[in-house]
Amino acid sequence: LQIQDSGKIILKDLDETIQSMKELAQKHKDTVCIGRSHGIHAEIMTFGVKICNWIDILERQRANFIHALDEIRVGQISGPVGTYSNIPPEVEAITCKKLGLMPARVSTQIIARDYHAYFMQSLALIASVIEQFATEIRHLQRTEVLEVEEGFGKKQKGSSAMPHKKNPVLSENLCGLSRVVRANSIVALENIPLWHERDISHSSAERIIFPDSFMLVDFMLNRFNGIVKNLVVHEKNMLKNTNKFGGIVYSQRVLLKLIEKGLTRE
């Protein structure tokens, strides 16, 4: 029940973050920038298209999260080893219905922990894609690129030793927190192989990984939403970087024309 209530908060965070990303994509649908593969200039695209890719990724994780939230909506009152030896299945059915849960199809003294591990993977995926977006912002904020910057408050300080610097500290923070959520998801996987019909080795770990992961993902989504809303986009630098090597980014068009004339790719 706590997972279901916490899940509603995460869904709200996801919806708000996706909406902010859609507004950013719409604003920069015609903002020309260079696309990169392997970190190297590839072909021209728009910054709006880049953000649309992020939106698609996060919307997919939203759908995955809803599915995982539904999968873990199970309960059981089936006795010490799941045989209903001292309590009829009707009690389980009535209780679960009142709580908005589905009775587990088969259970022991507890619900199998693969349910919980699957759910934790959905949180880890959300954290990981947020890290993906944050990493891109960090790369684009590098001095020699400087296509975007995190918003910088009037009273905010840069480096304590080098005050000219504006470090992407918020995005760096998100990358670090993502590692913690992923580590928690590994713990959830390790909770699956319990002894026989149950032991409590999973219990102590779950008391940490579930509340911590929910709080971390909630924090990460809210922080990333703030980054998106306050993102400074340097359109002139995007255009400058796009034209940095002249027309070399059109090499594929030239290649295709040469192939049409009978030349080989080699």
Regions found by a protein language model. Name each.
Residues 26, 97, 259:
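Short polybasic/polar patches that bind polyanions
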Residues 2-5, 49, 117-125, 253-261:
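Short, well-ordered beta-strand elements within core beta-sheets of diverse protein domains
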Residues 6, 10-13, 17, 54, ...:
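Alpha-helical packing segments of well-folded alpha/beta enzyme cores
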Residues 162-266:
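Glycine-rich cofactor/substrate-binding loops
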Residues 1, 58, 89-90, 249-253:
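A generic alpha-helix surface/boundary motif
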Residues 1-42, 101-115, 196-203:
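Long, non-coiled-coil amphipathic alpha-helical linker/lever segments
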Residues 3, 7, 51, 112, ...:
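Amphipathic alpha-helical coiled-coil segments and their boundaries
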Residues 12, 22, 43-194:
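Internal glycine-rich alpha/beta core junctions
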